[in-house]
Curated annotation (Swiss-Prot):
Biological source species: Lysinibacillus sphaericus (strain C3-41)
Protein name: Ribosomal RNA small subunit methyltransferase H
Known EC number: 2.1.1.199
Main location: cytoplasm
PANTHER family on file: 12S RRNA N4-METHYLCYTIDINE METHYLTRANSFERASE (PTHR11265:SF0), S-ADENOSYL-METHYLTRANSFERASE MRAW (PTHR11265)
Length: 316
């Protein structure tokens, strides 16, 4: 079973200000925790559209959401194609969209998926198992300079060059095939003093490779921009992020869309096309309560941001 403890459940869904007759999108179906709580609040006129690029998640969600299946549409797709998929399914605008970014617990806990540095498994890390690029290709075929770039940019790893050099040296003699082999090379590349603090030494490198394999930041940016366009005025977007790169991206997009541009002095009235598109519902991100962290330690880095659309200037 795709067993996953849902993070910030009520805060995320309640933040959407659910209209029972509305149309809502869960861009990251996963274990269907958010979807189940949301669909329970919908009337027979309401609709929930669930995206996931992992077919296992969709198949399991169909079982979990069986009592409400008449209100649910499942879309097997990366959420970066949010706009085109919604339009293809006949939805021109929706009333709310939620995102729970990052890897779901079942993906982490299934060794053969290759996401976890705690299990020895083939280097994979694909969220969409039909995709072609895997962690094996990144680790064994990408140039030293490209490895340094992703380790530093996506993993914020101070020892990016040292780790990339260890990988480059090791793969000359034989391919690096497993997560266990990669973990050992990472440990060799990071000085002992640095390894003793800041959690598992492989955490940042694995994050960087995972983001590169799945183009997570590019997909999130594309999707969030489309989400702003696709929601009705009064509709909301809830986004849970799990690391600073995701949160920074989300914060930047929302800040830009909720800010006034530079205006000429003494302008008597602000034209509609210059007014902000969004209003920030959460000035500062919502974080899990102590009670939630007691039962789900994986939620410790989660941050929730919620915005509301107040101007439809972007639509034709």
């Amino acid at each position: 079973m795709f067993d996953h403890t849902t993070v910030l459940l009520k805060e995320t869904v309640d933040g959407l200000n659910i209209d029972p007759d509305g149309v809502y999108v869960d861009c990251t179906l996963g274990g269907a925790g958010h979807s189940e709580y949301l669909v329970q609040q919908l009337s027979d006129k309401g609709r929930l559209i669930c995206f996931d690029q992992d077919m296992t998640a969709i198949e399991n969600a169909k079982i979990r959401l069986a009592p409400y299946i008449e209100r649910v549409t499942f879309i097997h797709s990366n959420f970066r194609y949010l706009k085109e998929e919604l339009l293809a399914h006949g939805f021109e605008q929706v009333d709310g969209i939620l995102y729970d970014l990052g890897v779901s617990s079942p993906q982490l806990d299934t060794p053969e998926r290759g996401f976890s540095y705690h299990h020895d498994a083939p280097l994979d890390m694909r969220m969409d198992q039909t995709a072609t690029l895997t962690a094996f290709e990144v680790v064994n075929q990408w140039a030293y300079e490209d490895l340094v770039r992703i380790f530093f940019r996506y993993g914020e790893e101070k020892f990016s060059k040292q780790v990339a050099r260890k990988i480059e040296e090791a793969r000359k003699s034989a391919p690096i095939e497993t997560t266990g082999q990669l973990v050992e090379l990472i440990k060799e590349g990071i000085p002992a003093a640095a390894r003793r603090k800041g959690g598992h030494p492989a955490k940042r490198i694995f994050q960087a490779i995972r983001i590169a394999v799945n183009d997570e930041l590019g997909a999130a940016e594309d999707s969030l921009v489309d989400a702003i366009d696709m929601i009705n005025v009064g509709g909301r977007i809830s986004v849970i992020t799990f690391h600073s790169l995701e949160d920074r991206l989300c914060k930047t997009i929302f800040k830009e869309a909720s800010s006034l541009p530079e205006l000429p002095p003494n302008l008597p009235v602000i034209p509609d096309d210059m007014k902000p598109t969004l209003k920030l519902i959460t000035r500062k991100p919502i974080v899990p309560s102590d009670e939630e962290l007691e039962v789900n330690n994986r939620a410790r880095s989660a941050k929730l941001r919620v915005v509301e659309k107040i101007n439809d200037k972007g639509r034709e």
